[in-house]
Every structure is written in structure tokens, then in C-alpha cells.
From Swiss-Prot:
Ranges annotated as biased composition (Polar residues): 9-22, 57-89, 158-184
Skewed-composition ranges (Pro residues): 105-145
WW domain: residues covered: 187-220
GO terms, biological process: mRNA cis splicing, via spliceosome
Locations listed in the record: Nucleus
GO cellular component: nucleus; U2-type spliceosomal complex
Main location: nucleus
Region span, Disordered: 1-184, 290-309
Coiled-coil regions, chain positions: none
Lineage of origin: Eukaryota, Fungi, Dikarya, Ascomycota, Taphrinomycotina
Biased composition (Basic and acidic residues): 292-309
Name of this protein: WW domain-containing protein C2F3.14c
Stretches with biased composition (Low complexity): 23-41
Gene3D superfamilies with a match to the protein in the record: 2.20.70.10
Length: 331
């Protein structure tokens, strides 16, 4: 009875491994319910391998320690494993040992050596030498010489001198130059060439006689500017013969300027003009606003003046002060 309980306990824990993955060092646990008498003794039991070279010798955990030779072969085990339910993920049990050899199509373990030959299509390892010959279509390495090709010989830029060899070199025909640089034009005497500079987006001109270049077109006529008048005009006084400056014009002889000149001797005219910004006194008084006291004083003065005029009409003594009022008094 104890052995059957042990078998049931182990059958719930153990998991099966397909027979296709069984090797000499693998272990099998079965949970079948077949009624064959030959397999009744090994159902639900865990077996361990005895010996390194023994492929078919197993020892049961529930049987005595004495060994026995199993008459079953791998073909019988495969037939048993087909009838047994297999789990999706086969994991080793606690009592089982990890197989030494990895399963097929699995990555190597850390302790296993890395294969020396790389797989096809993989880059070379750091220790491997780099192939000397470059692949077709790749640019040359820095240490390799640049292949010599018939590159187009550019025309001289501005502020550069042209060597005599390049000047006398006629290898580049006009047709090739026109194909490479169709924007080159020569003058009538083939002395000056207008060359297009794509970097500056402008033409520069090459003079073959002086072997110089410039951005200005020498064929264009220079703008004729009127010569400067270097003569000076001098005025002298007709009567005194003194030098007359430019500001001494006939306008200085006007009445206003004469009065200004004479009054400057006694008054500071410039300061008085700047005080009211050149405005007249009448305009200044119109814009002026009087206070209440000033208005009362002005009214009182006007009343006094009217009273004095009324009394002067009837007072004869006032004729001595103002003789012009005598006619009014006589009438």
C-alpha cells in the first residue's frame, strides 16, 4: 500500500519528457493507466541511470537497491510516451539532474566554448583580421591612394594669378568647356573672358594680357562724373574795398536788419525774442489769463479814468493840465 501511495504522489508532481528528446543521460517519468503487466511495475515511478555506459539499466526509487536489467528498449518507451499526456513546457524536477548536452536549436551555455567559425552573413569578430580587399562599390580607405581621373580643371577665381602652363594648355577644347561651363564668354579680341562663379552666383572677368581677374567689367564705360569746381568766389565792398563774407547779402540793408543792428547796442534783443518764441506781444496778451485780483484792479482803474474825464468837463482848472479840453469847457 505504501508503494501505491508513493506512486500516486509522484504521478501528480512528475512531468513527462517526449521520447524524441530522450538521450543516454535523460530520465523519464510516466503517468500512464495502461493495464499491461509488463509496465505495471514502472508506472508512476522515477528512475535514475546506473553507470555511464549502461543505456537500458534503471533503478526504481521504491524498489530495493539491487539492480536489474530492463528488457525494455527505446521502442517500448516511445510507445508508452505516445499514450501518455505530455505537458506543453517540460521542466526538470528537483531530483532530476540538468542534462550535460544542450537540447538541439538552443543557444550554448556560458561555460561552453564559442564556435570558432562564424555563421554565414555575420560580421567578423574583433580578433579576426579585416579583409584587405574592399568590397566592390565602396570608397577607398584613407591610406589608399585616390584613383586618378580626368577631373575638370576649374577656371581661376578672382584675385588669383594664372600660371603660364595652364594658360598655354589647350587640352580642354572649347566644346568641352562649353559643356562643363556654358557660361564662359570671350570678348571680340579674345582678351577678356567672363566666367561664371557658381559659389558667388556672379561673373568675374579674366584679363589674359595682364593675367589678372576682377569682379568689375573692364569693357563697360566708366561713368563720366562732372569735374569738381575748385574756383572760389570772393566779394569786396565797392566803397571800402573790404572782404565781404557770403552772409553779407543785400538783405542786410533792410529796415528790419538796420533796427536790429542799432538796438543791439542798448538792449539784449536776442534774449527778449527767445523769451516769447518770436511771438508778438498782442498774441501773448490774448493767451494770458488774469487772476481775480488783477481783474478787480483793472475795473477800478477804468472807473477812476471815467470819473476824471467827467469832472474835467466842468472844471476850468483842468485846462492848465490838458489844454485840448478848453473847447469842451467853453461850449
Amino acid at each position: 500500500m505504501s508503494s501505491s501511495k508513493d506512486c500516486k504522489a509522484t504521478s501528480n508532481v512528475d512531468q513527462t519528457i517526449p521520447a524524441s528528446n530522450v538521450n543516454s543521460g535523460d530520465f523519464i517519468s510516466s503517468n500512464t493507466s495502461s493495464s499491461n503487466s509488463e509496465n505495471s511495475n514502472i508506472q508512476g515511478k522515477h528512475y535514475t541511470q546506473v553507470g555511464e555506459d549502461a543505456d537500458n539499466s534503471f533503478i526504481s526509487e521504491n524498489t530495493p537497491k539491487n539492480t536489474f536489467e530492463s528488457t525494455q528498449t527505446y521502442e517500448n518507451l516511445e510507445s508508452i510516451s505516445k499514450n501518455e499526456p505530455t505537458s506543453e513546457a517540460s521542466k526538470p524536477l528537483l531530483n532530476e539532474l540538468v542534462p550535460e548536452e544542450p537540447l538541439p536549436r538552443e543557444p550554448p551555455l556560458p561555460n561552453e566554448p564559442v564556435p570558432e567559425e562564424p555563421l554565414p552573413g555575420e560580421p567578423p569578430l574583433p580578433d579576426e583580421p579585416v579583409p584587405e580587399e574592399p568590397l566592390p562599390g565602396e570608397p577607398p580607405l584613407p591610406n589608399e591612394p585616390v584613383p586618378e581621373t580626368n577631373c575638370h580643371k576649374e577656371s581661376p577665381l578672382s584675385d588669383e594669378t594664372v600660371s603660364e602652363t595652364s594658360k598655354n594648355d589647350t587640352s580642354n577644347s572649347p566644346t568641352n568647356e562649353n559643356q562643363a561651363q556654358p557660361s564662359i564668354a570671350w570678348s571680340e579680341g579674345h582678351r577678356i573672358a567672363a566666367i561664371w562663379d557658381p559659389s558667388q552666383q556672379a561673373y568675374y572677368f579674366w584679363d589674359t594680357l595682364t593675367n589678372t581677374t576682377s569682379w568689375n567689367n573692364p569693357l563697360e564705360d566708366e561713368e563720366q562724373t562732372s569735374p569738381l569746381d575748385y574756383t572760389a568766389k570772393v566779394q569786396f565792398n565797392r566803397l571800402s574795398g573790404k572782404f565781404m563774407p557770403k552772409w553779407a547779402s543785400p538783405e542786410l540793408r533792410s529796415e528790419e536788419n538796420k533796427a536790429h543792428k542799432h538796438m543791439e547796442q542798448y538792449f539784449d534783443i536776442n534774449s527778449s525774442l527767445n523769451s516769447h518764441n518770436g511771438q508778438s506781444l498782442l498774441a501773448e496778451r490774448r493767451n494770458k489769463r488774469y487772476t481775480r485780483k488783477e481783474m478787480e484792479q483793472m475795473k477800478r482803474r477804468t472807473k477812476e479814468k471815467k470819473e476824471m474825464k467827467r469832472r474835467a468837463l466842468y472844471d476850468i482848472a483842468s485846462d492848465e493840465k490838458d489844454f485840448r479840453r478848453r473847447k469842451i469847457i467853453r461850449y
